[in-house]
Design a protein with these regions (language model features):
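Hydrophobic or amphipathic, alpha-helical segments that drive membrane association/targeting
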Residues: 2-14, 43, 54-58
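Glycine-rich, acidic and aromatic/proline-enriched surface loops and short helix-turn segments
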Residues: 106, 110-114, 146-147
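Amphipathic, interaction-prone secondary-structure segments
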Residues: 37-68
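Active-site scaffold of zinc-dependent metalloenzymes
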Residues: 56-94, 110
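Post-HEXXH active-site segment of zinc metalloproteases
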Residues: 94, 110-138
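Short alpha-helix carrying the canonical HExxH Zn2+-binding catalytic motif
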Residues: 92-108
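Long, well-structured alpha-helical subdomains associated
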Residues: 128-133, 142-195
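Zn2+-dependent metallopeptidase catalytic core
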Residues: 16-46
């Protein structure tokens, strides 16, 4: 039998692909807000995924964000119905897969697969430099972005730049060069084949 980490990563990939498909299909069907709930079991780790999909004119095309703790993942999706179309589907699916992989990394951390996660207590909107340089966040971001870059067939440095530039456009105080430098050093250890 394989190591717990390898089993977790293999099942995580299946989970992400299946859930992204289910969530995507639910997102393009209908106009009413909906809630989806799924349960998934990784050996000894039970994962509960709760998804809230809403439709709003107050977002550009779509907005996806999530959180996790212990064995729960929460995903929030807001869609601008008129602008959400076939041209945006590919990016939507890539962002969704990135988010699911990011949050699954945290589930693995919470449950001791990668060592025990720390409780951060940081609101990312208040201290982005600290948030982006926490070891557990670095790994979660890099694994999520790696999943996204594979889906979009881009390179990881492009995805890092895109993510950090998006945050920098909202908060000019973020030290994107410093964060990117730290992330690249970590990439050399956990995902060296991506560089």
């Amino acid at each position: 039998m394989g190591s717990p980490v390898m089993i977790y990563k293999t099942k995580a990939s299946s989970f992400i692909n299946f859930m992204a498909r289910e969530i995507f299909m639910a997102s393009i069907k209908g106009t009413k807000a909906k809630r989806l709930e799924f349960d998934f079991n990784f050996n000894d780790i039970y994962v509960s995924l709760k998804v809230r999909i809403s439709y709003s004119d107050n977002v550009d095309v779509f907005d996806i964000w999530g959180s996790s703790s212990d064995d729960d993942i929460q995903v929030h999706i807001s869609i601008h119905q008129k602008d959400f179309n076939t041209q945006s589907y590919n990016i939507f699916n890539a962002e969704l897969r990135d988010l699911l992989r990011h949050e699954l990394e945290h589930i693995g951390q919470w449950n001791g697969i990668y060592g025990k996660a720390e409780i951060y207590g940081l609101d990312p909107s208040h201290d982005l430099d600290s948030y982006f340089t926490q070891p557990y966040e670095i790994d979660a971001f890099l694994y999520g972005l790696n999943y996204k870059r594979k889906y979009l067939k881009t390179n990881i440095l492009t995805e890092i730049d895109t993510l950090l530039n998006r945050y920098h456009s909202a908060d000019k105080t973020i030290s994107t060069d410093m964060i990117k430098s730290i992330w690249i050093e970590r990439l050399k250890i956990i995902l060296p084949h991506t560089l």
